[in-house]
């Protein structure tokens, strides 16, 4: 579980969100990130703990409060929003990848979509070695990215005085990311042998890594004067390393969205197989990312 949630935390979306906090300055921005993640991760923990103790997926736990019909409504809505998340994440990842190697965003949509399908086909329980290698690579590459931002960036930084961001809004943005995993986390804690420890490990790992991503984004905007991570990495000459960060961070995060859409579909129609639906969701998300412009909703 820890590796899965490490992958969820390493995300281009979280880095981009971190850039919005730059007008607060590093110290106040970091305080907002920490407070927001403590609030969000507490709620994330209890949501995951319910599923872990009951041995039920996220949408099955909803039925405990809203009944069978109410649970069906939430399951349908959850599938729809996870399809949307899958499309948006693929779109963002493809744009970032195309900013490094200009081969066309649609090419990267297909590459990212294919890798997500591979992740789902292998299955959560069989991802051990693949995840270990992918997470180790991402860990090393993100440290390299930190060095570029915090040690090779401009000492003058960017003029962000014209941008408005209240402390409360920054806390809200920091709460948003862990909160977004509430309809998903139980899908990955339901089979835990030690519910409290497994859920705590998942949430702590995610919370720490998510804070790290926010800080990378915020630091990028403050110290380099640039909010586009792809441009920062390209200027630093990271090349293939930059591409690997973008692609694998997108895959390891979006995989959870697509797979959980499949798990939620099982709450609607018991005969459906979650991994099969997850693959279909990935295909739909990939096609949507290629066809529809999503700049205004990312």
In which residue ranges do the predicted regions lie?
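Hydrophobic, membrane-embedded alpha-helices of multi-pass small-molecule transporters
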Residues: 1-14, 146-152, 159-222, 234-256
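N-terminal hydrophobic signal/anchor transmembrane helix of membrane proteins
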Residues: 1-28, 117-126, 131, 219-223
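Transmembrane alpha-helical segments of multi-pass small-molecule transport proteins
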Residues: 4-5, 72-79, 100-122, 136-146, ...
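Extracellular loop-to-transmembrane helix junctions
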Residues: 18-49, 70, 206
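Membrane-water interface regions at transmembrane-helix termini and the short interhelical loops
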Residues: 19-23, 49, 88, 92-100, ...
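Juxtamembrane helix-boundary/capping and inter-helix hinge elements in multi-pass membrane proteins
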Residues: 22-27, 52-56, 63-71, 190-198, ...
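Hydrophobic transmembrane alpha-helices that form the core helical bundles
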Residues: 70-102, 250-267
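Membrane-interface helix termini and inter-helical loops of multi-pass transporters
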Residues: 94-99, 152-162, 223-233, 294-297
């Amino acid at each position: 579980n820890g590796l899965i949630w490490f992958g969820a935390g390493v995300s281009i979306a979280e880095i981009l969100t971190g850039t919005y906090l730059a007008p607060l300055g590093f110290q106040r921005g970091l305080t907002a990130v920490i407070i927001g993640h403590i609030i969000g991760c507490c709620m994330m923990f209890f949501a995951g703990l319910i599923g872990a103790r009951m041995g039920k997926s996220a949408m099955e736990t909803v039925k405990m409060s809203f009944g069978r019909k109410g649970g069906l409504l939430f399951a349908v809505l959850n599938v729809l929003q996870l399809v949307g998340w899958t499309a948006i994440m693929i779109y963002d990842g493809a744009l970032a990848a195309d900013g490094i190697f200009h081969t066309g965003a649609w090419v990267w949509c297909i590459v990212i979509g294919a890798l997500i399908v591979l992740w789902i086909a292998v299955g959560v329980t069989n991802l051990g070695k693949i995840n270990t290698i992918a997470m180790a690579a991402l860990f090393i590459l993100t440290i390299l990215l930190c060095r570029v931002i915090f040690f090779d960036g401009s000492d003058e930084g960017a003029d962000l005085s014209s941008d408005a961001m209240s402390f409360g809004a920054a806390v809200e943005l920091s709460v948003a990311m862990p909160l977004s995993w509430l309809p998903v986390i139980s899908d990955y804690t339901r089979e835990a042998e030690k519910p409290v420890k497994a859920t705590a490990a998942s949430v702590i790992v995610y919370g720490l890594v998510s804070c790290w991503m926010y800080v990378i984004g915020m630091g990028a905007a403050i110290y380099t004067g640039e909010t586009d991570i792809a441009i920062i990495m390209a200027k630093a000459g990271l090349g293939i390393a930059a591409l690997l960060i973008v692609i694998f961070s997108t895959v390891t995060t979006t995989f959870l969205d697509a797979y959980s859409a499949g798990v939620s579909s099982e709450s609607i129609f018991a005969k459906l197989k979650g991994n099969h639906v997850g693959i279909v969701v990935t295909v739909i998300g990939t096609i949507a990312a290629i066809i529809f412009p999503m700049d205004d909703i990312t």
